Design a protein with these regions (language model features):
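Glycine- and acidic
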Residues: 41-49, 85, 123-135, 160-163, ...
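Class I S-adenosyl-L-methionine
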Residues: 79-148, 529, 557-564, 572
Length: 618
């Protein structure tokens, strides 16, 4: 049976059950939009139940054809005593693990709803992926990570204890087991897996069965103790144990510093309570998670700023790993660039040995149906980092941690750049930063567009309101027709009124898409403009601003900003870090007719060669 046929069959059963929700005691009653809406509240639960049943039936077909003690295996490993068959027929049972995996991935990439006009219940959607943070690694990528992680194991492979953390459908697990000469021993003694998705975990257990030919009742229990349905991020306490929280005895007692190697694609989910997106129930659930992780006392390095499951997972995996053990992870590139990951990143680099980092641009499809700038890193627990092997497309080179400390002493960023670009960074490292010029003020727009709405009017006043969307290529686009009441000015700080108010300033957008070639674009605003907080501004004397206009619109500053900016915002603290040449060397009256002319002039002041200017040109 092909996967398309299987998906169609699943849709058929979901539709048959869901359509019953539209029936009423009165057969002539109209099916209103309210009836459809109420049915769609329940259809996801129906879809999940039928999906679970079809997976179990496929598993039953596989187990009953391969093992004589099918009843024991189904009862112990898959928690089911009986299967109500739907008539599935699979000619080649060896394809069943793959069919189950593809069916589950399709389910996670789907949204289910009823419509009066169609019997189609499934549509493509990333809602579940976003909600669960579950995006599966392609198998060949998982194999590469396993290979790199095992290259420096602290013990012989046949003795190693290995964990697939947040295993999903076992993409890493199935690439670990072949390392063991005795596959059954690998399944029952060496390799472990943990996840909170029951269907995905069942598929991992099914894959484990695909490596062995027999399994006693006692060995069934052993398998279940190795591939466990638990939340690895939550630890049980002795007073109020929770069934899905991990306990000291789980995973054969290895959960605290017992594993020789851990491989993982951890869940990627920003824990941001948002009732408009997640609903009241979903928002409350996220808030409960946030409260738990911040107060449980188990995490030190991943609880600053907006919480993200992938950062929490990395810290948890380090806890589960032996000193000298190896960690192989695929996760968002923000780990090595974003300020929110600073504390965790410093811990990884300064208290462990980061061996290698491979960067992948957003355009490279490492995941199915998801685009995400990603990195793969290999780490040895303990010690400290020295040389890191960096891979960026075809460019492979070493960067010493001392250089990272020299260039980025505060945050230890490791940008996604080529080896020749590191040479440019070295040249810039000796220059003063924008924040070190006392006569230059770098600020966010003074009018908060949410909190200060009462000061905004459509009636003309001396003060035009400038929003970020009004910032054009060379001038402010007068498109919104909004003004600011004069009564707003006295509400601002004395510093603002002294140094910024009634002055011409350099301004840029506060939001600038991370995928744009040009992220930084500064223009002048009028002296009477009031800036919304969707703008950033720089104020100083007019000659200094004229010089900064040239510098900040050059390719070199645009490049420098981009390499450590990991989101769509232009933050003032990022602008503060920009390297600024000696302003006495800049001709404030310099004029140019092209970006190339500007870059040649500014690039030469920064000491860049022609090839270096070309490398970073907008």
């Amino acid at each position: 049976m092909e996967i398309k046929t299987l998906i169609s069959l699943e849709d058929k059963y979901i539709y048959q059950d869901a359509i019953e929700l539209l029936n009423s005691d009165d057969p002539f009653a109209p099916i209103t939009s309210e009836v459809i809406e109420n049915a769609n509240v329940k259809i996801r639960e129906i879809a999940a139940r039928i999906h679970h049943h079809i997976l179990l039936e496929l598993i039953y077909i596989y187990v009953s054809n391969k093992f004589s003690n099918c009843t024991d295996i189904m009862q112990i490993c898959f928690n089911t005593n009986s299967i109500c068959p739907t008539g599935l027929y699979i000619s080649n049972i060896d394809t069943i693990p793959s069919l189950c995996e593809h069916l589950h991935i399709s389910f996670l990439n789907s949204k289910f709803s009823l419509s009066i006009k169609s019997s189609k219940v499934r549509s493509k959607s990333k809602e579940q992926l976003i909600e669960l943070g579950a995006v599966y690694t392609q198998s060949h990528i998982a194999k590469n990570i396993v290979d790199d992680t095992f290259a420096n194991l602290p013990v012989p492979i046949q003795e190693a204890k290995v964990l697939d953390f947040a295993c999903g459908t076992g993409r890493f697990y199935e690439n670990v087991i072949p390392y063991f000469e005795d596959k059954k021993k690998g399944v029952l003694f060496n390799v472990y897996a943990i996840d909170l998705d029951l269907d995905a975990l069942n598929i991992t257990r099914l894959k484990a069965l695909s490596f062995i030919d027999s399994l006693s009742k006692e060995e069934c229990f052993t398998l279940c103790q190795h591939i466990v349905l638990k939340d690895a991020l939550r630890k049980n306490n002795s007073f109020f144990p929770e069934p899905l929280h991990i306990s000291p005895t789980d995973l054969d007692g290895l959960a605290e510093g017992g594993f020789d190697a851990i491989v993982s694609n951890p869940p990627y989910l920003v824990l941001k309570p948002n009732k408009s997106k997640a609903g009241v129930g979903g928002s409350d659930k996220i808030q409960e998670q946030v409260n738990y992780y911040r107060t449980c006392g188990f995490y030190q390095y991943s609880i600053e700023g907006m919480l993200n499951l992938y950062q929490l997972s990395i810290e948890r995996m380090l806890q589960m790993l032996k000193i000298g053990g190896e960690l192989g992870i695929i996760c968002p590139s923000t780990l090595f660039g974003d300020v929110s990951a600073k504390k965790l990143r410093k811990h990884l680099l300064l208290r462990n040995n980061v061996r290698s980092i491979r960067f992948f641009a957003e355009k490279i499809p490492l995941f199915e149906n998801v685009n995400q700038a990603t990195n793969i890193f290999i780490l040895q627990k303990g010690g400290s980092t020295s040389d890191i092997t960096i891979s960026e497309e075809e460019d492979v080179f070493d960067v010493n941690i001392s250089l990272v400390k020299e260039l980025f002493p505060e945050n230890l960023e490791i940008p996604t750049i080529k080896s020749s670009e590191w040479d440019i960074l070295r040249k810039l490292s000796t220059l003063k930063k924008l924040k070190q010029f006392p006569s230059i003020r770098n600020r966010r727009g003074e009018l908060d567009l949410s909190l200060c709405r009462e000061f905004v009017t459509s009636a003309p006043t001396p003060y035009r309101l400038v929003r970020g969307n009004m910032i054009g290529e060379s001038e402010v686009k007068d498109i919104n027709g909004e003004f600011v009441l004069e009564s707003f000015i006295p509400t601002r700080s004395k510093d603002y009124r002294t140094y910024d108010f009634n002055r011409k300033r350099l301004i840029c957008q506060q939001i600038s898409n991370g995928g744009l070639r040009r992220r930084l674009r500064f223009i002048f605003c009028a002296s009477t403009d009031v800036l919304g907080n969707s703008c950033n501004y720089i104020s100083s004397d007019e000659e200094t601003l004229a010089k900064l206009y040239l510098i900040l619109n050059s390719s070199i500053l645009n490049w420098r900003f981009k390499i450590t900016s990991s989101n769509n915002h232009i933050n003032n603290y990022e602008l503060d870090e920009l390297p600024i040449i000696d302003l006495d060397k800049v001709d404030a009256t310099f004029s140019y007719s092209s970006q190339e002319e500007l870059d040649e002039y500014i690039g030469s002041l920064y000491g860049l060669s022609k090839d270096e200017r070309k490398l970073i040109a907008i």
